[in-house]
From Swiss-Prot:
It holds the Pfam family ATP-grasp_2. Heterotetramer of two alpha and two beta subunits. Succinyl-CoA synthetase functions in the citric acid cycle (TCA), coupling the hydrolysis of succinyl-CoA to the synthesis of either ATP or GTP and thus represents the only step of substrate-level phosphorylation in the TCA. The beta subunit provides nucleotide specificity of the enzyme and binds the substrate succinate, while the binding sites for coenzyme A and phosphate are found in the alpha subunit. This is Succinate--CoA ligase [ADP-forming] subunit beta. GO terms for cellular component: cytosol; succinate-CoA ligase complex. Pathway: Carbohydrate metabolism; tricarboxylic acid cycle; succinate from succinyl-CoA (ligase route): step 1/1.
């Protein structure tokens, strides 16, 4: 679950991390009121779950409350990559001398919580990794002891912070961000940028937190922050139907049971020169209704030219999947070619149900991927 910037800002502030003054607003009048309370230049920032809001005109500076009103009026209601701006963060605009990146992630390769820091903040960390990977420093925290203050100070020195007082403050901020990550079951927590003020103090200018949906039952207060209106409709539909769905940029829709098989399917599609349009795991024991819902979600994407179904039936019954496919074809208006591989429990019955449907059968994963890629290229 993604949090808006203003929500992430409130969470990191609870952990002793200094943030800029400001507040959230849903109308231009509220924007002006917050700007008056700040009493100086402000930044009016669109709160949407997509990147590139600055380039889209979703961030504006204002020197007076009247200018803030105009900025709020311009941004609220704006469409940014398909999402409507319903709230803005009105934050104090400050002068700073340097930008730093600080983030916390779960590194599955090392099975550790890892802190990432860079002296090149203010830009996407992925861009820094491409252009100057040596500017990125990583530190793995011990899962039993947690992040130790001396480790955080070493991280500060590693990114060029030489002032002892500043290094101690960085250590405090890094420890706070680490705690925010662990205690809220997050997948990502980052401050970008963490800025150095003219007086040498550090302050978080922008915060981002992504929570693990599987841990939300332990955090009812945070779970209530979910902004359904700010999420893609496809992800909302998937969650309501118990599906795991991630939209990608390709044109080959994928419906698979099991996360591992879904990733393997996407890899094989890439191997044969295709581009998956999504990751979609229908899970174990999926019934016809869930399969139909999955196909409906996939076909909501206008880029999809073909759907590849790859089912290895264990708990999931192939005949139930087949029934769902046939049912979906009856009710879904948009029809595209489908390549179907069914192997496992009730396989023969599933093949019988699909015999009269306008589908392309496949016997192996490689066969299915090749056929799907060939159709997508037509």
């Amino acid at each position: 679950m993604k949090l808006h910037e203003y929500q992430a800002r409130d969470i990191v502030a609870r952990y002793g991390i200094p943030v800029t003054g400001g507040g959230v607003a849903a109308t231009a009048e509220e924007v002006q009121k917050v700007a008056e309370q700040i009493g100086g230049p402000v930044a009016v920032k669109a709160q949407v779950h997509v990147g590139g809001r600055g380039k889209a005109g979703g961030i504006k500076l204002a020197n007076t409350p009247a200018e803030a009103f105009d900025a709020g009026k311009a941004i609220l209601g704006m469409d940014i990559k398909g999402l409507t701006v319903e709230k803005v963060l009105v934050a104090e605009a400050i002068t700073f001398e340097k930008e730093i990146y600080l983030g916390v992630i779960l590194d599955r390769a090392t099975k550790r919580v890892v802190l990432i820091a860079s002296s090149e903040g203010g830009v996407e960390i992925e861009e820094v990794a491409k252009i100057n990977p040596d500017a990125i420093i990583k530190l793995a925290a011990d899962p039993l002891l947690g992040l130790q203050p001396y480790q955080a100070q070493e991280l500060a020195y590693s990114i060029g912070i030489t002032d002892a007082k500043q290094a101690r403050q960085f250590s405090s901020i890094a420890t706070g961000l680490y705690r925010a990550f662990v205690e809220n079951d997050a997948e990502l927590a980052e401050i970008n940028p963490l800025v150095v003020l003219p007086n040498g103090q550090l302050q978080a200018l922008d915060s981002k937190i992504v929570l693990d949906d599987s841990g939300l039952f332990r955090h009812s207060e945070v779970a209530g922050m979910r902004d359904i209106a700010g999420e893609p409709e496809s992800e909302i539909k998937a969650r309501e139907n118990g599906l795991t769905f991630i939209k990608l940029d390709g044109n080959i829709g994928c419906m698979v049971n099991g996360a591992g098989l879904a990733m393997a399917t996407m890899d094989v599609v890439n191997l044969f020169g295709g581009e998956p349009a999504n990751f979609l795991d229908i899970g174990g024991g999926a019934n016809a209704q869930k399969v139909a819902a999955a196909l409906d979600i996939i076909l909501d994407d206008p880029n999809v030219k073909v759907v590849m179904v790859n089912i290895f039936g264990g708990i999931t019954r192939c005949d139930e999947v087949a029934k769902g496919i046939v049912e979906a074809q009856k009710i879904i208006k948009r029809q595209v070619p489908m390549v179907v591989r069914l192997v496992g429990t009730n396989e023969a019955e599933g093949q019988r149900i699909l015999a009269d449907a306008s589908l392309t059968p496949a016997s192996t994963l490689a066969d299915a991927a090749q056929k799907a890629v060939d159709i997508a290229k037509q």
